[in-house]
Design a protein with these regions (language model features):
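OB-fold (S1/OB) nucleic-acid-binding surfaces
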Residues: 92-106
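Short histidine-centered loop motifs in beta-beta connectors
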Residues: 104-129
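Acidic, glycine-rich catalytic/binding loops that coordinate metals and/or anionic ligands
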Residues: 24, 119-127, 137, 141-202
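Short, surface-exposed secondary-structure boundary micro-motifs
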Residues: 80, 131, 136-137
Length: 202
């Protein structure tokens, strides 16, 4: 007998079990304030097309402001102000971005971040609360997208993360509200091994 089959490649893990209550860190320096805005469009994220349904978190910021990882993961793509390489290898079509594969199989894209000092590398593990870059010149917003490939559809699944707003509380962020940035060690260490905690939590 002959069997027909298709080979599919997924950037994220379509079978990953997502904990919608997982606590994400607000991606700025602890002690600072972060103001949230309503993201109206993700134009340019997926080529000339915009997904029919999507969710994104936007923060007002300023050029040169440090940006920190909201969650532990592995860097899969670092893009400056222009894209190179084969489009079929891209995770999306945004520039000035860092994309990270998270432990639950989802991807997080930090849009409007540059690795000015070239300290990040693809396949490098980064930890929640670790600086990953700065906001580029002439930019006053940072956008976060958490997404996952769908197993039986070309559509992406977008996740609305819950962010840590104080030592013991997480919530969905509200547009136009100002939040104090906190990075509790117990949250930063959630996806670290004991050895990683000793090296990174001081």
């Amino acid at each position: 007998p002959r069997f027909n089959y298709d080979i599919k490649f997924f950037r994220s893990d379509p079978m990953g079990e997502i904990n919608l209550d997982f606590p994400y860190l607000i991606p700025f320096k602890p002690g600072e304030n972060a103001k949230v805005f309503d993201v109206k469009t993700i134009e340019g994220f997926w080529g000339s097309e915009e997904p029919d349904s999507w969710n994104a978190t936007g923060f007002q910021t300023a050029p040169g402001e440090p940006v920190f990882a909201s969650r532990t993961g592995t860097v899969v793509e670092i893009v400056g102000n222009t894209r190179t390489g084969k489009p079929e290898n891209w995770y999306h079509t945004w520039t000035n971005s860092v994309t990270v594969l998270q432990p639950d199989g989802t991807l997080i894209c930090y849009r409007n971040v540059i690795d000015k000092n070239k300290e990040l590398e693809v396949n490098e593990k980064i930890f929640a609360g670790e600086q990953i870059g700065v906001v580029p010149p002439n930019t006053n917003e940072l956008i976060l997208l958490v997404f996952q490939n769908s197993l039986n559809s070309a559509d992406l699944r977008f996740i609305i993360p819950r962010f840590v707003v104080n030592e013991d509380k997480t919530e969905l962020l509200i547009s136009s509200k100002v939040y104090s940035v906190v990075h509790p060690e117990k949250i930063r260490g959630l996806e670290m091994s004991r050895r990683e905690k000793r090296r990174n939590l001081k």
